[in-house]
Amino acid sequence: MADTTFDIDDTERRMRGALQSLKQEFAGLRTGRATASLLEPIVVEAYGQSMPINQVGTIGVPEPRMLTVQVWDKGMISAVEKAIRSSGLGLNPNVDGMLIRLPIPELNQERRAELTKIAAKYTEQARIAVRNVRRDAMDELKRLEKDSHMSQDDHKSWSEKVQKLTDKVIGEIDAALAHKEADIMQV
């Protein structure tokens, strides 16, 4: 019996996608230092549709504790300002002509704890996504065995490989959380 009908690479790709998605979510969590990626999750209502902030202006980091957004269309300034205020990042935009300045305030202990909880929530969502991919892979393996496309031994072997992969990716997710928590709590 051939076991080539199961694609563990696809399973790994999907699990790694959950990890990448988590890292993008983490990039949007403020740590007290200015980074352009902090504004990436912000969506602006522009021209009748939702657009990422980097499609309506240029994001700059002129100082370690300052971000700027150079808006390309004067009519978009209020929409960009509104999107930043409603983003939940705790930023207070200052409009200066076509430039929006965003001073990055020092994080207080309460906000650090709140950001840590948000990071933990994102991490749990990533773990769930990985477990869902694992479940899909296990269901596929059961189906292949049931349809006689795979022997019991091959099924057991592939199941163990999927479980090892799951454990590895969840370990990487947990390591990413530990790194982000340390970053947030650093004064």
UniProtKB/Swiss-Prot annotation:
Compartments, record wording: Cytoplasm
Main location class: cytoplasm
GO annotation terms (biological process): cytoplasmic translational termination
SUPFAM superfamilies cross-referenced by the UniProt entry: Ribosome recycling factor, RRF
Pfam families: RRF (PF01765)
Signal peptide region: none
InterPro entries: Ribosome_recyc_fac, Ribosome_recyc_fac_dom, RRF_sf
Keyword Cytoplasm: yes
HAMAP family: RRF
Family the UniProt entry places it in: Belongs to the RRF family.
Protein name, per record: Ribosome-recycling factor
Organism whose genome encodes this protein: Parvibaculum lavamentivorans (strain DS-1 / DSM 13023 / NCIMB 13966)
